Amino acid sequence: MSRLWAVVWLLVFAVAASGCAGVPNSSAPQAIGTVERPAPPSLPKPTPGMDPDVLLREFLKATADPANRHLAARQFLTESASQSWDDAGSALLIDRVVFVETREPERVSVTMRADILGSLSDMGVFETGEGALPDPGPIELVKTTDGWRIDRLPNGVFLDWQQFQSTYKRNTLYFVDPTGTTVVPDPRYVAVSDSDQLATELVSKLIAGPRPEMANTVRNLLGAPLTLRGPVTRADGGKTGVGRGYGGARIDLENLSTTDPHSRQLLAAQIIWTLNRAGINGPYVINADGAPLDDRFTDGWESSDVAATDPGAFAGAAAGLHALMNGSLVSLDGQRAPRVAGSFGQAPNQASAAISRSGQDAASVVVLRPGAPDMQSTLWIGPLGGRAAQALEGKSLSRPSWSLDDAVWVVVDGANVVRVIQDASGAPARIPVDAGPVALEFPGPIAELQLSRDGTRAAMVIGGQVILASVEQTEGGQYALTYPRRLGFGLGETVVSLAWRTGDDIVVSRKDPQHPVSYVNLDGVNSDGPSRNLAMPVTTVAANPSTVYVADARGVVQLSPSTAEGDPTWTEVRPLMVAGTIPVLPG
């Protein structure tokens, strides 16, 4: 949120300087990238009979298209205003705009009031926000021979929310996680009206790189000095029908420095999943410096050729659903829920647990004297079905979360984030994680911390809010939580528990009886899940790409998919319908 307000105050500050602003010699990178294209036909244009109020509203709609330095919006400006208006940087998305006018026969001075709903960076990164727009300063209109035109306005861009929704489409870029195991989502908003140019736009964005907070958390195999030789075409070189039907897509790259086969496969995975998830179908013919990227795929790649990196894959799915029932770990076996073998099935007083990403190991927190002044919590880690070893202790420990490298992350006493790994001798090593940026921006106890499935992000519950941070490995091999920001302003301070459903989608349980389960994505946009057949309180949530489980007052229930009869509903997991039982999944 602090970055959003920084954008606001920069815009406000810019008003003071706008009187002496010169013609900007360059514009910021277009929010939709570098593709040259005509303005979308739906954008408004000024007409001689427009009233000043109407002209201003149409101007805000026209700012939705940044092509050619917001040429569509500049049609609403006088020549001098167009020369001095600096459209660089992020745009503020506003709604419920009110104009307060002071009129003279030939000039109108306007003060604008609005609600902030978010910001859109020059890379196409959207983040939600909230609050009233600080007064950006006066906007002045003058009567010209062509009708009213804006003669003075603040620097920066204010974007009408409704027009943004109708002009921009959300697409996802994919970069590589540090282990080279999977790809990591980076959602962007793109306003390309010509579908044949979308593939070029997305590949260009891949080459430009990830959003700033991901720069030190992912790898980009398409980074400099790699470039795109020309527009993406059909597989046969045609310029229309790119990625539609069986036409496929052809991507010609140059300056490739990657030589090893695995890195080339990861490069292909970035392109393929980015285009595939945007509805641009294969085969994907990928050439580098005039030759096939991989001689095995001269006729093109399919998504199945990079299935190992599928961002929707769930590696631990075979482990199935587990639960903590009466303090011990059980597994779901048809209509039975027997205790698992080994320590996790025998130990009492387990309050939270998680299965490893591989489904082979487990971690659980045992709590003695819960709620008492001398409460004690211990973390146990070991093979699922085998013998566990104590790894950590504290007064309180959060629900454990596994990373891709089989480290277990927990929060000790609500403040200290710790990463537990096995050292060379097999003993647990406890390594502190730098959570200083989180504590500085969002002070308060961390009630939960869950790593994304790709391990590059951490979602936390702090003060009933969802806080997202990047997981960054430092040069010394340590880890830090950086770039914290709040997600889901509409959730208030009601969040109890959270779980990653996919790399871009978080499920939360809440104290709100009207909306006990909600969703929030990486942009911060939240929506409500069904509430029918849930008994408050709803506590622990566990999720994977296909299913959501929550613990309510009766036991564990799962979200059943939509049927012909209606919307998704919560159904009982019969063997786990014991009060106090909580769901456990890999993650």
Swiss-Prot record:
Region (Disordered): 26-47
Predominant place of localization: membrane
Lipid attachment, kind N-palmitoyl cysteine: C20
UniProtKB keywords: Cell membrane, Lipoprotein, Membrane, Palmitate, Signal
Lipidation (S-diacylglycerol cysteine): C20
Source taxon at top rank: Bacteria
Signal peptide range: 1-19
Membrane topology annotation: Lipid-anchor
Matches recorded under Pfam families: Germane, Gmad1
GO CC term (a single one): plasma membrane
Cell location: Cell membrane
UniProt biased composition (Pro residues): 38-47
NCBIfam families recorded: PRK13616.1 (NF010141)
Family: Belongs to the LpqB lipoprotein family.
Name assigned to this protein: Lipoprotein LpqB
Organism: Mycobacterium sp. (strain MCS)
